UniProtKB/Swiss-Prot annotation:
The protein's name: UPF0102 protein CMS0765
A single GO molecular function term of this UniProt record: nucleic acid binding
InterPro entries: Restrct_endonuc-II-like (IPR011335), tRNA_endonuc-like_dom_sf (IPR011856), UPF0102_YraN-like (IPR003509)
Source organism per UniProt: Clavibacter sepedonicus
Family of this protein: Belongs to the UPF0102 family.
Amino acid sequence: MRMTREQDLGRRGEDLAAQHLIERGYALVERNWRCREGEVDLVMTHGGTTVLVEVKTRAGLRYGHPLEAVTRAKAARLRVLAGLWRQAHPERRGPVRIDVVGVVWPRGGQPSVEVVRSAC
């Protein structure tokens, strides 16, 4: 099945976000973890903390910065997903936080990446 342009942009944004975080000392644990309540884009570790990462990617700022797409409702859902992830992975002890990564990747241009730690 072919990806839509939006799906391809989202996948490339997740790839770039993962690489960006790895270059800053994060380690990738899992991609696209799914459960009945939704999906976590990236699960990583950073300094002994498990980090669930939501990645938002846009081709431009016409509809606002991608970080603006994380509404209160989305943040609440991410917190629920964090709890469910912990239940599914009892072997992973220690702190958990939620980071959000905004990627702006204009057609034919250079992408920019912004990370908000402990966003939710």
